[in-house]
Amino acid sequence: MSDPSTYRPAPGTIPTEPGVYKFRDPEGRVIYVGKAINLRSRLSNYFQDLSVLHPRTRQMVTTATSVEWTVVASEVEALQLEYTWIKKFDPHFNVKYRDDKTYPVLAVSVGERFPRAYFYRGPQRKGVRYYGPYSHAWAVRETLDLLTRVFPIRTCTKAVFNRHESLGRPCLLGYIDKCSAPCIGRVSESEHRIIVDGFCSFMAGNTDSVVRRLTNEMISASEALDFEKAARKRDDLNAVRKITEQQAVVLGDGTDADVIAVAADDLEASIQLFHVRSGKIRGQRGWIVERTDNSESELEELLQSFLIRFYSDEVAHEDQVSDKELTVARRGVDKQSHESDLANRRINTSVVPKEVLVHKAPANVEQTTAVLRSLRHSNVDVRVPQRGDKRALADTVFANAQEALRQHKIKRVSDLTTRSAALQEIHEALGLDEPPLRIECTDISHIQGTDVVASLVVFEDGLPKKSDYRRYKIKEAAGEGKSNDVGSIAEVVRRRFARYKNDCRMVPQEDEFDGSRFEDESLAGENTVAAKQRFAYSPQLFIVDGGAPQVAAAQDVLDELGITDVALIGIAKRLEEIWLPGEEDPLILPRNSQGLYLIQQLRDEAHRFAITFHRQQRSQRMRRSILDDIKGLGPARRKVLVAHFGSVKELKKASESEIMMVNGIGPALAHSIYVALHPDSDDSSVQ
């Protein structure tokens, strides 16, 4: 713990202009990034008496050992640079917007050659468009079931697609016309892309054109006395209307807007966002944010920060998706028209709407609006509605934020009490200096010494931190069908803590111009500079799955590396005994102990993660062919070879001259293939 007075800038050295500042810890890592209209005024707040600071702020300034700043020309540039640095450095003490990923969504993998629509629940991925979220999983599946009548988009997994592609016949959905069957070439890549574009356009809110088209097609078929086709179009029209009727009109003027509200208590804030397109609610999202202050101005700044970070991330994601679509489109015959369609759609369906309606105004509305305007490339209106339907909807969103916060508080109190008790029990039972806020656990998985792998799982504050999970292929302690569990544990511990020591020695690269003034062009920093050093912080407790031998091996590695500030234990499966280094007898925790339960959770999670990775490795090995290891023989040539001879077994019967007859196989490669398939043969012989 450092004393802020030791690194407080000298009086008069801090400028009074707008800027962005960074606090760094003893290893030089950026732990907090902030912006200010007046740098001197803002930074002086951090060097007050520690007793008057918010606990989180107090912890930050006592962790830091230096502060730096960059002067910019305007507050808009400060907002943009703050966002850039937060994305770049991922500071530990900056506010984390914890997205509520429990709601299901309808996803479309537009980055694939043949995109598919599917049910999804989780974080966003590149090359995928998301629609929703929905309140229930069945709502996603019902929507998909109804829409595939009108837009027969692919919905199967890659494995199913490849299987039917090789079989040459479609699945059931292809037979009943709820899939266009691109797997067997019933439609081309460009034709399927048109279906996908129509599906995405409908989900984005452009429903009227679909209704008009189906109505006209139904009437035309009826007039042509094609009553069977007219009946199909009628059913399609009813399916579309059923979906649109499920979404009530909340704004009669057909507005495109996002409506946002914040509800807060002393510890956290709940942010709710409703996406309104063409006057109908198309989606709802929620976040929980930790507060650093209890003032009204802090909530205003929190909302401002959220608006900039949320829409900047959405625009970046949209650009990545569109770039993938363009890459796919370049393989199609209608490249020019599809690129034009994408460009038009980017303008018409920007992720930043024309109106951003907020229940209460954010800090510095003008500057916030300027940033959003630059993201949209056209006008954006950020305002608090005062009356009518828009005010009523803003109140509804605020009520949702209050309810989300209430539900979170109930869960928070229950979870926090239990987790605190568990960490306190571990603290007391092991005689640690403080409760272990970061705990790591490793486990080994293999079958009779094959595909030996290890997992490393991380819990912080008693909760899984899955972004820090790691998987290891055991290299030194395994091989030739043999496995040494004790040696494998030692290898994992050595690799993990060698990484820790290396990360601690790394000095963050600098591409900032501290103390300089700059305009917009200097805001475009390098995105590759700040690799997240997730393992630069050591755990307070490290757990190995095993008994005394595994613990002793792990302790030897820690001693070898000079790691003295990490507590080590092992948990034996049979009796759930806790083993400590150098102890002859295990520690027995009560069966009803919350501390034991948390340790078991870590052990079970490490086991689950390890066995999942082991199965993946085993599956990949079983799918491998002897042809995969031949140098110079890529996937395309392997496919041609197997297709020519019918199987690897038949290929083995072929001579070198017969192998050379295959298109793309030269004499040298044919010889390499023959030798690989006949390892006991004389290499010098020519068939």
Curated annotation (Swiss-Prot):
Report the HAMAP family cross-referenced here: UvrC (MF_00203)
- List membrane-spanning regions: none
**SMART domains for this protein:** GIYc (SM00465)
Q: Which family does it belong to?
A: Belongs to the UvrC family.
Every UVR domain range: 208-243
Record-annotated GIY-YIG domain positions: 16-95
GO CC annotation, single:
excinuclease repair complex
**CDD domains, sorted:** GIY-YIG_UvrC_Cho
Primary location recorded for the protein, binned into one broad class: cytoplasm
Q: What is this protein called?
A: UvrABC system protein C
Q: What does this protein do?
A: The UvrABC repair system catalyzes the recognition and processing of DNA lesions. UvrC both incises the 5' and 3' sides of the lesion. The N-terminal half is responsible for the 3' incision and the C-terminal half is responsible for the 5' incision.
User: Which InterPro entries does the annotation name?
Assistant: GIY-YIG_endonuc, GIY-YIG_endonuc_sf, GIY-YIG_UvrC_Cho, RuvA_2-like, UVR_dom, UVR_dom_sf, UvrABC_protein_C, UvrC
Question: GO terms for molecular function, please?
Answer: DNA binding; excinuclease ABC activity
What top-level branch of life does the organism fall under? Bacteria
Query: Do you know which Gene3D superfamilies this protein is assigned to?
Result: 5' to 3' exonuclease, C-terminal subdomain (1.10.150.20), GIY-YIG endonuclease (3.40.1440.10), UVR domain (4.10.860.10), UvrC, RNAse H endonuclease domain (3.30.420.340)
- Cellular compartments annotated: Cytoplasm
Question: Does this entry carry the keyword Transcription?
Answer: no
What is said about its interaction partners and assembly?
A: Interacts with UvrB in an incision complex.
Going by the UniProt record, its keywords in alphabetical order are: Cytoplasm, DNA damage, DNA excision, DNA repair, Excision nuclease, SOS response
- GO terms for biological process, alphabetical: nucleotide-excision repair; SOS response
